[in-house]
């Protein structure tokens, strides 16, 4: 069994990892081959690259400077922005500046359910209903209305 020397958590655009910050400095201090990681990450996330999603990744670095990485599902906020039409390649919108007072978009319960199903593997929620409530809470704090 290899000895783990570090674990790095990053959020990178799908299919667009490059040696520039934050990837280069984070991996460089652990002695990892940066280009090798970029190639592997970009190959693994090629399918999501068209959707311009941010993919969280956990990189485990071993004593012999080898590494493994685990991809997570995109953050709920990114998926909600996409569903509400706030997140596109051209327009990278943010949530409301005053959540609770102003609304920047809306999503249907069906879209919330779809996002919850996508996020279930990375959530600690015990059921789909609980996951949906979590996603609805995220939407509320972003100023996105849930309708239907």
Swiss-Prot record:
Q: Which UniProt keywords apply?
A: Methylation, Ribonucleoprotein, Ribosomal protein, RNA-binding, rRNA-binding
Might you name a Gene Ontology BP term for this protein?
translation
Q: Name one Pfam family in it.
A: Ribosomal_L11
User: What does the record say about PTM?
Assistant: One or more lysine residues are methylated.
Transmembrane stretches, by residue range? none
* Entry keyword annotation includes Chaperone: no
Q: Which SUPFAM superfamilies match?
A: Ribosomal L11/L12e N-terminal domain, Ribosomal protein L11, C-terminal domain
GO cellular component labels? cytosolic large ribosomal subunit
Region Disordered, annotated ranges: 89-108
Q: What InterPro entries does the annotation carry?
A: Ribosomal_uL11, Ribosomal_uL11_bac-typ, Ribosomal_uL11_C, Ribosomal_uL11_C_sf, Ribosomal_uL11_CS, Ribosomal_uL11_N, Ribosomal_uL11_N_sf
Q: Does the keyword RNA-binding apply?
A: yes
- What does the record give under GO molecular function? large ribosomal subunit rRNA binding; structural constituent of ribosome
Q: Which PANTHER family match?
A: 60S RIBOSOMAL PROTEIN L12, LARGE RIBOSOMAL SUBUNIT PROTEIN UL11M
Member of which family?
Answer: Belongs to the universal ribosomal protein uL11 family.
Question: Function of this protein?
Answer: Forms part of the ribosomal stalk which helps the ribosome interact with GTP-bound translation factors.
User: What is this protein called in UniProt?
Assistant: Large ribosomal subunit protein uL11
User: Top-down, what is the taxonomic lineage of the species of origin?
Assistant: Bacteria, Pseudomonadati, Myxococcota, Myxococcia, Myxococcales
């Amino acid at each position: 069994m290899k000895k783990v020397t570090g674990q790095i958590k990053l959020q990178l655009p799908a299919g667009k990892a490059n040696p520039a910050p934050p990837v280069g400095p984070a991996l460089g201090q652990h002695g990892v081959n940066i280009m090798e990681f970029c190639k592997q990450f970009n190959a693994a996330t090629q399918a999501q690259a068209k959707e311009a999603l941010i993919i969280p990744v956990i990189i485990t670095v071993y004593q012999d400077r080898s590494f493994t990485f685990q991809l997570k599902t995109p953050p709920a906020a990114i998926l909600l922005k996409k569903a509400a039409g706030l997140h596109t390649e051209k327009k990278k919108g943010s949530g409301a500046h005053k959540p609770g007072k102003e609304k920047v978009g809306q999503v249907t319960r069906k879209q919330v359910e779809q996002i919850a199903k996508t996020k279930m593997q990375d959530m600690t929620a015990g059921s789909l209903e609980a996951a949906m409530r979590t996603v609805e809470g995220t939407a509320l704090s972003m100023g996105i209305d849930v309708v239907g």
